[in-house]
Regions:
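A short acidic Gly-Thr/Ser loop motif
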Residues: 7-12, 131-137, 200-203, 279
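N-terminal glycine-rich anion-binding loops that anchor highly charged ligand groups
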Residues: 24-35, 68
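N-terminal amphipathic/basic leader segments beginning at the initiator methionine
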Residues: 2-16, 25
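Conserved beta-strand/loop subsegment of P-loop NTPase cores
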Residues: 71-75
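Broad gene-expression machinery/nucleic-acid interaction feature
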Residues: 3, 12, 30, 128, ...
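Short glycine/serine/threonine-rich phosphate/pyrophosphate-binding segments
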Residues: 13-14, 37, 112-115, 133-139
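Helical "lid/coupling" subdomains associated with nucleotide-phosphate turnover
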Residues: 1-3, 17-20, 40-68, 78-127, ...
Length: 297
C-alpha cells in the first residue's frame, strides 16, 4: 500500500509519500513549500490574502506527490490555521483544491501524531522527551518507551519568533529579548528526568545540513548548535541561503529555532540533541493504519 500525507503548518506545507512494508513506513518522496501562514496570523489574527499563495503551495506539493501515485491522501492543518479567525474557511478551500478533507487538528492531537512518528524510530525505555518545534508552536512530550506521559503545546514557533524579534541578521540584544520571551513560555513545559531529547520539525531536520552536507550527523551537541547559529547569523539571510543550500525564509526561521532548541536542552539539563526526520506526517500515516478514517481524532 502507498499512502500520502499533507500537513499545512505555520511556516510550511509538506507532502510525504510512503510505502507500507510489513507495517513499517518506507519513504518514497517528500516535498515542501514555505507560504508562512503563521507570521500573517500572528500579526492580524487571520490568513486573509495569504490564502491564495498558501493554496498554490499546497497544490504544488500534492501535484508532485501524485507523480508517485498513492492509494490514500491524508491532510491536516495545525497551529496557524487553528488560530486564524478564517481558519475553517481556509481549510475548506484547501480541501477543495486537493480533493480531500483538510482536518484542523487540535494541539493535543498534533502532539500525539508527532510523537507517534518520532517514537516509531527514537523511543527508549526510560523517560525521554520529544520537542516538535514548528513555525507557530512547539509541542513538548514526556514519554516512557512509546507511551506518552505528559504533553503541552507552547506558543513558541520559529517563524513567529523570528518575525517578531529579529532583524536580518539578528542583533545580540534581539536574541536576548527572544530568549527571555521564549523562556517565559518554556516554564510551562512538562517536568521530567529525561535521558534524551529528540527534536523534530523544520529547524531540527535542517540543522545537520548547516554543519555539513556530507554525512550530516543524527545527533547535535550544544557546541554544534552554537556553530550553526554563528553560520546562519554571519550575513543577511539571502546571502547565507546560498552557502548553506536552504531558502532564505528557512534561514530566518532557523535562527530563532536554534535558540528555542538550546533553551529546551538547558531546561532538561542535557547537552545532546537527537534529530528526528520523522514527525507529524509519519504519525498521520501510522494513525491511519491503526484507526482508519478516524486517524485525526
Amino acid at each position: 500500500m502507498r499512502l500520502a500525507a499533507v500537513d499545512i503548518g505555520s511556516n510550511t506545507v509538506h507532502s510525504l509519500v510512503a510505502d507500507v512494508v510489513k507495517g513499517q513506513l518506507v519513504e518514497v518522496a517528500h516535498y515542501v513549500e514555505m507560504p508562512e501562514l503563521g507570521v500573517q496570523v500572528a500579526r492580524t489574527g487571520s490568513i486573509g490574502a495569504r490564502a491564495k499563495p498558501a493554496i498554490r503551495a499546497l497544490r504544488a506539493v500534492v501535484a508532485r506527490a501524485r507523480t508517485h501515485g498513492f492509494d490514500v491522501l491524508l491532510a491536516c492543518a495545525t497551529q496557524a490555521v487553528r488560530q486564524a479567525d478564517d481558519g475553517a474557511d481556509f481549510a475548506r478551500s484547501a480541501g477543495d483544491a486537493i480533493g480531500t478533507t483538510v482536518h484542523v487538528i487540535s494541539a493535543l492531537r498534533e502532539a500525539e501524531l508527532s510523537f507517534l512518528g518520532v517514537a516509531s524510530r527514537h523511543a527508549v525505555r526510560r523517560e525521554w522527551a520529544m520537542v516538535d518545534l514548528g513555525g507557530g508552536s512547539t509541542e513538548v512530550v514526556i514519554a516512557r518507551g512509546r507511551e506518552m506521559q505528559r504533553s503541552v503545546s507552547l506558543p513558541i514557533g520559529s517563524g513567529v519568533l523570528a518575525s517578531t524579534y529579529f532583524s536580518d541578521p539578528p542583533k545580540p540584544e534581539e536574541r536576548a529579548r527572544m530568549r527571555k520571551a521564549a523562556l517565559r513560555e518554556l516554564t510551562h513545559a512538562p517536568d521530567g528526568e529525561v535521558e534524551r531529547l529528540v527534536a523534530t520539525g523544520g529547524t531540527a531536520s535542517n540543522l545537520p545540513f548547516v554543519l555539513t552536507h556530507r554525512n550530516p550527523p543524527p545527533v547535535l551537541t550544544t557546541a554544534d548548535l552554537l556553530t550553526c547559529e554563528a553560520r546562519l547569523d554571519r550575513a543577511r539571510a539571502a546571502q547565507v541561503a546560498k552557502t548553506v543550500g536552504l531558502p532564505a525564509n528557512r534561514v530566518k526561521a532557523m535562527r530563532a529555532g536554534i535558540e528555542a532548541l538550546l533553551l529546551c536542552l538547558d531546561w532538561y539539563g542535557l547537552a545532546v540533541l537527537q534529530i528526528s526526520h520523522e514527525g507529524v506526517r509519519q504519525g498521520m500515516l501510522l494513525a491511519y493504519l491503526e484507526r482508519g478514517n478516524d486517524w485525526w481524532r
